[in-house]
Regions:
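Non-heme di-metal
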Residues: 11-14, 18, 23-237
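Extreme N-terminal basic, low-complexity initiation segments
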Residues: 1-6
Length: 237
C-alpha cells in the first residue's frame, strides 16, 4: 500500500504560551472529520488502565519531527521483537505464525513512516529510547515459561498503547497524516489480543494477576513525568 504524502507539511496547533499548565486543556482539532474511535475495539479500552493524558497530546503536537522519528523507531523495534521470538521459540507453531505475520506488517509500516518522513523533510536521526519499554521489562521474570509470559504481556501493552495513541492524535494532525494513522489503527488494533492469546497458551494457570500487575505498571509510566518527548513517554515534566 502506498500513501500520497501531499505537500509534506504536518499541522502544528498554535500555542499562545509554552506554560505547561496549558497542556491539560484540549488542543484544537485540525479541521477535518477523521477519527478512529470506531476502529478501536472495546477490549482495548478495557485492557488499558488509563487514557493518554492531554498533556502528552499537546507535547506531541509541539514535536512533530520527533513524533515521526520515534514512531519509525517503534515500528522497527516491534518487528525486531517479533523476529527475536521467532528465533527463540521454534517449537511453538502458533507463535511462529503470529510473529511472522506481525514482523512483516511492522516492517511495512516502518518503511511507510520513513517514506513519509523523507517527503516531509524530516531527517532520520538517532533518538535515545524512552523509559517506557525498559520500565516494563525490568519486571521480567528470569525463567521460561514465566519469562515468555511476561514478554508477551508487555508486547500486548505496547501494541495497545500505540494504537490508543494513534487514535488520540488523528483529530489533531493534518488530513493525510491522519488518514495514514487511521490505517495503522485499523491494521494493528487487535495485535495486543494476539500477544495475550500466546501468553495464555503458555500455561494452564490463570495469568490474570500477572496481566493486572503489568497494566498497573504501564499506567504509572504513562502518567508520570518525563523530560524528553517520545511516542511512549509520560507527561512533560
Amino acid at each position: 500500500v502506498k500513501y500520497k504524502i501531499g505537500n509534506g507539511v504536518m499541522l502544528i496547533q498554535p500555542s499562545a504560551s509554552k506554560d505547561r499548565t496549558l497542556q491539560t486543556s484540549e488542543p484544537s482539532p485540525a479541521g477535518h472529520a477523521l477519527k478512529a474511535d470506531d476502529l478501536l475495539p472495546e477490549s482495548l479500552h478495557q485492557f488499558l488502565a488509563c487514557e493518554t493524558p492531554k498533556a502528552w497530546l499537546q507535547w506531541a503536537l509541539e514535536n512533530p519531527a520527533t513524533l515521526l522519528i520515534d514512531h519509525a523507531q517503534c515500528e522497527k523495534k516491534a518487528a525486531s521483537t517479533a523476529m527475536s521470538l521467532l528465533y527463540r521459540y521454534v517449537d511453538q507453531p502458533l507463535l511462529l505464525s503470529k510473529m511472522s505475520q506481525l514482523a512483516r506488517e511492522e516492517l511495512l509500516h516502518f518503511e511507510q513512516v520513513v517514506a513519509l518522513m523523507e517527503a516531509r523533510g524530516v531527517a532520520y536521526q538517532h533518538l535515545t529510547a524512552s523509559r517506557y519499554a525498559e520500565g516494563l521489562r525490568r519486571h521480567l521474570r528470569s525463567n521460561d515459561p514465566e519469562r515468555l509470559i511476561d514478554v508477551l504481556i508487555i508486547g500486548a501493552l505496547i501494541e495497545a498503547r500505540s494504537c490508543e495513541r494513534f487514535a488520540c492524535l488523528i483529530p489533531y494532525l493534518d488530513e493525510e497524516l491522519a488518514k495514514f494513522y487511521r490505517t495503522l489503527v485499523k491494521s494493528e488494533g487487535r495485535h495486543f489480543e494476539d500477544y495475550l492469546l500466546l501468553a495464555r497458551q503458555q500455561t494452564s494457570d490463570s495469568i490474570d494477576e500477572r496481566i493486572a500487575f503489568f497494566v498497573a505498571r504501564e499506567a504509572e509510566l504513562i502518567t508520570s513525568p518525563d523530560t524528553a518527548f517520545r511516542f511512549h513517554s509520560g507527561v512533560p515534566a
